[in-house]
Design a protein with these regions (language model features):
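Bacterial N-terminal signal peptides that target proteins for export
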Residues: 1-9
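Bacterial N-terminal signal peptides
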Residues: 8-17
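Sec/Tat signal peptide C-region and signal peptidase I cleavage site
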Residues: 18-24
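Aromatic-lined ligand-binding clefts that engage carbohydrates, nucleic acids, or primary amines
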Residues: 74-89, 116, 186-209, 216-217, ...
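Exposed aromatic-hydrophobic patches
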Residues: 103-109, 223-230
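Glycine/proline-rich low-complexity spacer/linker segments in large multi-domain proteins
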Residues: 121-151, 246-261
Length: 261
């Protein structure tokens, strides 16, 4: 009985030590990779093409680009149809988001011609309600800026689902507002389940040791991603984050439990 008690104490001590080491670990982003490496074949069209029009049957990510003329005053960017979400960038600066419930965004742009980039994600298929038979995804219909219809669109698939993150070409990390892949490392004394705390990050996907482990979104109640022990190893582990809505984070952390808002 005494021997069993000692074993239990030792096991409990090891578990507590592991949990403490996990809680203490901050994962610094040290490398980054641009999205151009995983661009699919682009298509040009006068009006925006939906993901369905682009033969993206399983949804995913699609970049919409055109030019806007600004007079230096605030003006509204408005989309007729969007499913489900778009991060709005102008000149490599993030200005905000659009969604199927928030279809307008006020932009304060300097006077001149600017490249408008809308990084669109389809979150999932409609499985209930009056729109169940309409699973159009992406952007379609009229898009205006300052009440002027925008034309001359380029649509480029972003092949996140097909890419192998370990084969991307990375460079040293530097602060950016653009979407991309962001890499860091962390160490474990033993291979056990952990949780990646994604609090503060925007929206995207995560890989650990080149294996996909999950997605995150700042609007979700749960802010962590479970990483099974089978995806981990003793010693150094690599994490890669694909961030669509870049909040400017340069680190994430480990947790020994699920993290909620």
């Amino acid at each position: 009985m005494r021997k069993q008690a000692i074993v239990c104490v030792l096991l409990l001590g090891a578990a507590l030590a592991f949990a403490a080491s996990v809680r203490a670990q901050q994962i610094e982003i040290t490398e980054m990779a641009g999205l151009a490496q995983i661009f699919g074949e682009a298509q040009n069209n006068d009006v925006p093409l939906s993901m369905n029009d682009m033969d993206m049957v399983s949804g995913g990510y699609l970049l919409y680009e055109t030019e806007v003329e600004a007079n230096g005053e605030e003006a509204v960017l408005a989309v007729e149809n969007i499913r489900d979400y778009a991060a709005v960038y102008v000149g490599e600066k993030r200005y905000g988001e659009l969604s199927d419930t928030h279809k307008e965004l006020t932009l304060a742009l300097p006077e001149g011609t600017h490249k408008l980039q809308l990084y669109v994600e389809n979150i999932g298929r409609i499985t209930y309600g009056p729109e169940i038979l309409d699973n159009t995804r992406g952007l379609w219909g009229v898009i205006t800026y300052a009440d002027n219809e925008l034309d001359g669109w380029t649509m480029t698939p972003i092949e996140v689902k097909e890419c192998v993150v370990g084969e991307l070409i990375y460079e040293a990390f530097k602060p950016t507002e653009m979407p991309g892949f962001f890499k860091g490392t962390f160490s474990l004394d033993a291979s056990r389940e952990v949780h990646l705390n994604m609090s503060g990050w925007g929206m995207g996907e995560v890989w650990v040791n080149n294996e996909f482990v999950g997605t995150y979104w700042e609007n979700n109640l749960q802010q962590s991603i479970q990483v099974p022990a089978g995806n981990l190893k003793e010693g150094e582990n690599t994490v890669v984050v694909f961030e669509l809505k870049n909040n400017g984070n340069s680190s994430l952390s480990l947790s020994d439990k699920i993290v909620f808002k």
